[in-house]
């Protein structure tokens, strides 16, 4: 807000709250735009025609609000203005995180309350006829362009005409002013005089003290920049109705491109308030225009309206329902609302929780049904594939047996061929030996012949030679004969071998073809089986994985439901507590505001009294003393006012602090409510983090290798440090030797002291030099000591880190021990699993035996039932043949009787009786045959039922066998998983061993570091001692000469020492960095080991669950076997009962045959006896003619044929 140029008195430092000032002169044209904060107009005319009180009240977020004193245009206007800071301060206030506490009298969106009061004092029967707008002195928002200065109003707020919309008229009626309010209340109170005192002292009764619902459903406040960007909202004429008041929003006009610098916030506040009230109601209500009232004194208490479904929303709805058409007071209605809410709250909580649980349970049941359906389909498919698989397995076994038989034949033939080859080789060897002998003998013969030719000696020698020749010839002939025999044998063997080879080749070719054919068939069958088994196993594995996932999801959802229920209960309790705290703070704030308003009223009264007294004193009294006294009193009152304002500001700051704390608590509640959503995201992130952890494990292994390399580098560096330390020790020894030399030189100089005064002068000069050098040495020593101190500190830090590393290693050792224990427990569990597997195998063998026994018994039962059926069929055939014979006999007898009846004419009555008896007997026999036939059908039906039961039992046994095979596959799978677990455990042990090796390496490095540190400390102590000795010697050698060569050597040595110390510091920094890296790697390894341990525990849990499932399946198999035993026993009992029934039927049939035979014999005897008593032929012809006899015979034939 801009300040007026004709400001006379200084303005007070008022930024917030209420400010009251007197106005005793009309507002000039230059002052029509704004009212200054805390400023007063100069008191030129004390007795002006108009006066008033401008009350400035802090609004929401620093927004102003003004009520006119007079509604006439062009006249003077004074009134209440909600005053904020200047433009910059207001923007800052708007941008701050300031939330107001909940208004207990607020109306919720969508439920408008009746108009109880307004900021403007309207005439009776007038509702919202216009809207409060800014004064045209700053920027007129009533029209599209600025107004003339002559047309401007002197009031702060002016009732501007509404923007013309299609089909609407312009209403320029102003709001009624504060004077009209005073008149109205004066008239209501009856007789109270109009004036300022009446306004101050008049108190409304409780029934008329009504708060406005202007901003009860305000939205979260916007920033000043956003409000300045928005266009000014214009309102269409509102409709008046009985109970509810609202407003509807029309399209806004564009804002002027260059607003004036003194832009007032009262219009912004008004537009924003109306817009925030309009937005939620425009969605829920009809297009009918609802009225809206806003009051300036209660805008601070407004807060965001509760969303639909909340407690406040329910409270507002119940309040609106109870308030309609009721004449009760507001407190009684609110008490009823609170009672209804207390009774409804547990029902709402139960309904919300039950709906969520029912929805989750429905989803779970649907998923379980889908999984069960998939499992049933898989079982059916596997049952269909099972018979083909059994046949293929049988073919496979036959083919394998044939292959093994052929392989045995091949091996046998190969052995025979090898033996024949060996014999051939032996024969060839013998032939070669014979050939060699023949060649040798021929050579000998040739030699002898040569000797004979050469030696023509005496005859005895010739005879000897001839004898030798003969013997050799005989030997040669024998050898040739043996050779021929051997060759013949060889030829025979070769022929046999060629024949055998040809036969073998043919057999091998045929066998190879058969084997190839069988192998191809076997491969095809095995491929088909493999594919089917792989598909079945994959589907089964997928189903099991889905089932496990669903079970895990169900458990997780149950846990989450329990956790969410607990969390909701906790948060509800917290929310209730926070609500109570908010209400308490709200009540405190309301009390503080009431006290502040009372104090402001008292201050206003005091200030008015003081001003009146001051004016009276100025007008009447001329005494300066009284003026000074009044001035002092004014100053005191001003000081008191400032103190009160400071107290008020401190109270406001405390209220703001409380509001901020409440906002923080609300934010914490919202954050805690959002945690439930974040849990699902965290579950997804956990899977990603697991993959990242695996990648990190691989990277950790790589980093481990790098760490080992770095450890090797560290060892080399430590060796270098140790060498440098040894060199420093050697240099220190040299330094000691030089010091000893210096001491000797000093002794020599002491001997030369007696030489003379000239020598003393030279020695003094040298002593000065020595002192300077001594100072330099001391400085160098101090520097070296400081460097040693820094080295010691670095060593301490390294030791501390190494100790931490040792602790981490100790922790790793403990974790390794726990892992070893876990591994031992897993080994025990595996042993238990193996035992369980052995037991399952034993149970499987027992089940196989029982199934085989049951199959054999069922086969026996089937054979017995077939035999019984065959016997019954044979008996029935016999019965049929007997019946046919009896019918033929009866027909023959009937024919005989007919011929005899033709011959005889007597005994018709007897014959008719006999015929009737025969008919009855035939009917009885037919009835008995029918019963026998029915019994036979019943027996056939029972046999069919038994056969069906036997087939069902076979099927169930096949299903049981399939289940057993599935159990075997599961056991094999579990064994494979156990092997995998063993491999993982071995890998874990390898990693643990590597960790141990790393720990040992780190321990050795720590020991080396400690030894190096001890050496350095010893060197440091020795150096300190040497320094002390040097100091003492230098102090004693003052005044004696010292050679300069030794000083230069000492300086060079000091420089070398400094360089070495710097190098050591660098190496120490490098060592520190490597130690840090090692510590990080150790931490990563520990994390990796923990993850692996958790993974092992998870796998252990999975194995335990699978073992339980297998045990459950075994129990189910045992129950099924017991059920099959019961069915077998039941079938045996039924078969025994059937045998008994068959025996009974056979006995009955025999008795029937005996009865029929007896009846037939009796009837034949009676007919023979009664044949003589027949009547004449006419009588026979008349009573029993041939046509009747033929009909009887045909009836009997038909009856027999039907039987």
UniProtKB/Swiss-Prot annotation:
The modification N6-acetyllysine is found at residue 579. Residues 25-48, 89-268, 883-908, 1160-1181 are annotated as: Disordered. Residues 1161-1203 are annotated as: Tail. Its main location: other. The keyword Cytoplasm does not apply. It holds the Pfam family Myosin_tail_1. Residues 54-67 are annotated as: Interaction with TJP1/ZO1. GO terms for molecular function: microtubule binding. A motif (ZIM) lies at residues 48-62. The modification Phosphoserine is found at residues 96, 135, 137, 140, 155, 165, 214, 217, 258, 276, 338, 351, 1175-1176, 1182. One of its GO terms (biological process) is microtubule cytoskeleton organization. It comes from the Eukaryota. Keywords: Acetylation, Cell junction, Coiled coil, Phosphoprotein, Tight junction. GO terms for cellular component: bicellular tight junction; myosin complex. Residues 207-231, 883-903 have a biased composition (Basic and acidic residues). Residues 246-267 have a biased composition (Low complexity). Deletion of the TJP1/ZO1 interaction motif (ZIM) decreases but does not abolish colocalization with TJP1/ZO1. Belongs to the cingulin family. Probably plays a role in the formation and regulation of the tight junction (TJ) paracellular permeability barrier. Homodimer. Interacts with TJP1/ZO1 and SPEF1. This is Cingulin. It comes from Papio anubis (Olive baboon). The gene is CGN.
